Amino acid sequence: MMKVSAQNNFIYTNYTQNYAQNSVKAKSPSFCGAQRLTHMNIGMMGEGFIGNVLLKNVTKGTDELVNVFKNFDCGNEKYFLKNNEGGTIGEIMLKINKYFDYNRFIYKEDPSHVFVDKLRNYSNPNTPFWNKETDFYEGTGTRLLQIAQRRSDEAQCVGNIKLIPMPESRRYYTDKIGMIKDPTNPYGSAFILPPDKKEPLSKMYGGL
């Protein structure tokens, strides 16, 4: 029987909130200049604005730094990408599953992972969540997955991410991201990021 860390619930959430209350950035969210997530510990940031990521605005033909916001939802973490007008471009919810003990006969490698839920891309007209009032930003879904991957590394889940894709988005996850069906449950609907695809994902569009 696997033992799951309590960090995806009360303990971890309160630790990050307490840390953030003593953080200079948390007390001063209006710091000057672009704050990319490249070298930032995302998990240690409190709720609210945490930094920027670079996206290509296909509609306008420009590169834009969009804002990243974070909040907690019943022990899970939610991240939002918003443009400078405050419109939401995309969002994602993450659940951290850190296993301290697991069956080595079933799992050849550490099964700890970040479970991705409710990944929504509002800027892409080819997704069911498209908001026609929003400009089309290239790489929105990829940036959200990179945040999930970063949180997996920070939480010592060895970069593993897992999700259950919608039927219309499976080709995106398999062909572009390189995800595969969970080999420990081949009859299930979950997909994982295999080891050889972790670094390529982290470098897409120049990385976070």
Model-derived features: positions:
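N-terminal chloroplast transit peptides
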Residues: 1-6
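Non-catalytic substrate-recognition and accessory regions of acyl/acetyltransferase enzymes
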Residues: 7-143, 147-164, 168-208
